Amino acid sequence: MSTLIILRRIQVENANAIAGLTYGFPAITHFLGFTHALSRKLQASHGLTLEGCGVVSHQHQLHAYGSSWERSFALTRNPLTKEAKTAAFNEEGRMHMTVSLLIRCDGQIPADTTALCEHLKQQAQCQRLAGGTVIDIERVTVQSLPVDEAETRGVMRRLLPGFVLRDRTSLLHRHFQTLQQAKPQAEMIDAWLDFAALKMQAERDPSDETVQWKYLPKPGDGGFLTPLMIGYRAISPLYAPGEVDKTRDPHTPFCFAEAAYGIGEWQGAHRISDISQILWEYDYQNGDYHCRQVADTHSVAEDTSYEFDY
């Protein structure tokens, strides 16, 4: 039997805002990793399994400064070294955010969920989310999984104001095919950059020899589209434990990997009519580790022939 666990308005401080080539919001892998860690604890304590996770963003504050064209991350100043010199540091992108997580749970739920909700809140606050510290969770609820549009909209209305992260990687697939018809030498990275870049085009006015700069909309059918890191792809064979030096765990097989990218869309929570449309899940195949939504049936993540070729 499937139920829905809702962690309402999780306040996170100093979360990681950089994800591969993108910045501004943590990668979806962070949220599925948070769900996986919580699932392992629930399996041991209650025999429950967490399968999918939906993300609703209520508020975020990126630690950056500058104009709308040039922005720099606001970095911490480390203490001086013992030689009274400036200490070395790695550039980091941090942000504060308030999010809600909707998690599908499989297993037998007790009739009285009070103790389970308290246990979930305690365990979730002990974890890191996207490398940030969980400061507070407004409320934890456990309820039956919505089965129709009316029940789903009732759940989502209680999460307003907020925006849901949807998987729209299928748009990248379609745009790449269109781009190749005009430019046969185009690669997947070119199609992805069309979604990531802010483009302007000059239109000349023949009457007075002036030009007007106009914004070029992103490919697709509208919506708040954003580049997204969706997982990892293997770039080497699987090595035996201990074969590669200086790995984090010398007792586990090792493989080199690179980030995989897709396209996401932020949609108002009031527009969601099916809860399964917003649940992200793991997808393992052929050395690929991707996060995807079942609703995006033509995801590029399913087709290994579509990949970035640097």
Curated annotation (Swiss-Prot):
Interacts directly with Cys1; part of the probable Csy ribonucleoprotein complex with cys1, cys2, csy3, cas6f and crRNA. The gene is csy2. If the spacer DNA has a perfect match in the chromosome then toxicity results. Suppression of the toxic effects occurs via mutations in the CRISPR/Cas machinery, or via target deletion, which might contribute to genome plasticity. This CRISPR/Cas system can be used to remove genomic islands, and possibly other genomic regions. CRISPR (clustered regularly interspaced short palindromic repeat) is an adaptive immune system that provides protection against mobile genetic elements (viruses, transposable elements and conjugative plasmids). CRISPR clusters contain sequences complementary to antecedent mobile elements and target invading nucleic acids. CRISPR clusters are transcribed and processed into CRISPR RNA (crRNA). It comes from the Bacteria. This is CRISPR-associated protein Csy2. GO terms for biological process: defense response to virus. Disulfide bonds: none annotated. Keywords: Antiviral defense. Pfam families: Cas_Csy2. The keyword Transcription regulation does not apply. Belongs to the CRISPR-associated Csy2 family. Induction: Expressed in late exponential phase (other phases not tested); part of a large cas-CRISPR3 polycistronic operon. InterPro entries: CRISPR-assoc_prot_Csy2.
